[in-house]
């Protein structure tokens, strides 16, 4: 004689065992994979992963050196970062900080911009004052290559040359460099990149925000009379701003500001020239011709 209810328990156990075994035999792998309970989570996970990777590669992946700047970035992408050093008055070093403060740069412990030279080595984008983060370093292409930094050159403008390789310093070169340092050093800038030049620098149009206003660094330099239009036979980049740049240079000449200022009486007595100032392009051409004569 069985106890009351014992038969039901055994029946349930048997049903559970048969259901599990039967399900293994009844459901093929094809049926399992096409089951909505399997498909929906799989698709959701795949789409989320692909989207996250896409967002990271597009907006959050840091560009440590010029060699990581892909060709499809040119004329299509802006680089946001902090200027670590300024070289000559038309180039600087940039530490790329994708996403800015929203992505944690400047306040998360693992997203702090290095302040020491060894921390910046191999991690900044070099730009001859065209965009990006500034880093006070020599404009020597060899140093740029050795440090593997993002070196940025300002697009469309040419600033007076500092003393390099035994050549004399141009008038207003130091003033132009100090002006640029005051404007962008240790500040965040956005550089719209145009191309990579022969010295492995990124030519870019750079913007810096001062209060609520965004300023075009190259344009402001022309307005201050501390740079000229870049007049090389090839390689000049202006984006859509060439007319604006040329108008700013002409206005600075007319107002006689910066390098276009006429010498004062005391400067004339001291031997200052009253001729039109030698442009950076003329300076480079003169020294190139002199170097060529020395070799012959």
UniProtKB/Swiss-Prot annotation:
The active site is at residues 153, 161, 201. Its main location: mitochondrion. Residues 270-296 are annotated as: Disordered. GO terms for cellular component: membrane; mitochondrion. Residues 278-296 have a biased composition (Basic and acidic residues). GO terms for molecular function: endonuclease activity; metal ion binding. The chain crosses the membrane at residues 38-56. Residues 77-262 form the TNase-like domain. It is found in: Mitochondrion; Membrane. SUPFAM superfamilies: Staphylococcal nuclease. Keywords: Calcium, Endonuclease, Hydrolase, Membrane, Metal-binding, Mitochondrion, Nuclease, Transmembrane, Transmembrane helix. Belongs to the LCL3 family. This is Probable endonuclease LCL3. It comes from Phaeosphaeria nodorum (strain SN15 / ATCC MYA-4574 / FGSC 10173) (Glume blotch fungus). The gene is LCL3.
């Amino acid at each position: 004689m069985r106890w009351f209810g014992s038969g039901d328990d055994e029946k349930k156990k048997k049903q559970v065992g048969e259901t599990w075994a039967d399900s293994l035999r009844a459901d093929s792998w094809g049926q399992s994979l096409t089951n909505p309970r399997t498909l929906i989570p799989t698709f959701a996970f795949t789409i989320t992963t692909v989207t996250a990777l896409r967002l990271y590669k597009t907006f959050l992946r840091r560009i440590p050196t010029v060699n990581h700047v892909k060709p499809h970035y040119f004329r299509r992408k802006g680089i946001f970062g902090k200027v670590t050093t300024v070289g000559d008055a038309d180039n600087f070093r940039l530490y790329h900080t994708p996403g800015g403060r929203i992505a944690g740069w400047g306040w998360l412990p693992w997203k702090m911009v290095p302040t020491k030279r060894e921390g910046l080595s191999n991690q900044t984008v070099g730009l001859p004052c065209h965009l990006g983060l500034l880093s006070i370093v020599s404009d020597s292409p060899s140093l740029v290559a050795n440090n593997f930094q993002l070196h940025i050159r300002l697009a469309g403008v040419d600033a007076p040359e500092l003393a390099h390789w035994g050549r004399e310093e141009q008038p207003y070169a130091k003033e132009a460099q100090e002006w640029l340092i005051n404007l962008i050093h240790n500040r965040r800038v956005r550089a719209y990149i145009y191309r990579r030049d022969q010295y492995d620098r990124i030519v870019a149009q750079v913007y810096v925000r001062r209060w609520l206003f965004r300023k075009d660094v190259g344009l402001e330099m022309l307005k201050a009379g501390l740079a000229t239009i870049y007049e090389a036979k090839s390689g000049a980049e202006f984006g859509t701003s060439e007319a604006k740049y040329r108008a700013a240079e002409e206005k600075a000449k007319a107002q006689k500001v910066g390098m276009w200022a006429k010498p004062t009486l005391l400067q004339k007595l001291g031997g200052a020239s009253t001729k039109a100032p030698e442009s950076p392009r003329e300076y480079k051409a003169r020294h190139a011709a002199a170097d060529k004569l020395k070799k012959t």
